[in-house]
Amino acid sequence: LKLQKRLAASYLKCGKGKVWLDPNEVSEISMANSRQNIRKLVKDGFIIKKPHKIHSRSRCKK
């Protein structure tokens, strides 16, 4: 799944750590070996870009 994660990261314009692959669809994702297939999986919702983590500013504001 390394290749799929790398392709998805480049398509979603984010890092590999931000890419979430659906654990229930591992067989489907592992068959995808092109950018076109990755694009289809993103559209279907099997591959998602994780949201940004927001760091609390409460300690800075004190």
Swiss-Prot record:
Pfam families: Ribosomal_L19e. It comes from the Eukaryota. GO terms for biological process: translation. InterPro entries: 60S_ribosomal_eL19_sf (IPR035970), Ribosomal_eL19 (IPR039547), Ribosomal_eL19_CS (IPR023638), Ribosomal_eL19_dom (IPR000196), Ribosomal_eL19_dom1 (IPR015972). One of its GO terms (molecular function) is structural constituent of ribosome. One of its GO terms (cellular component) is cytosolic large ribosomal subunit. Keywords: Ribonucleoprotein, Ribosomal protein. Belongs to the eukaryotic ribosomal protein eL19 family. This is Large ribosomal subunit protein eL19. It comes from Zea mays. The gene is RPL19.
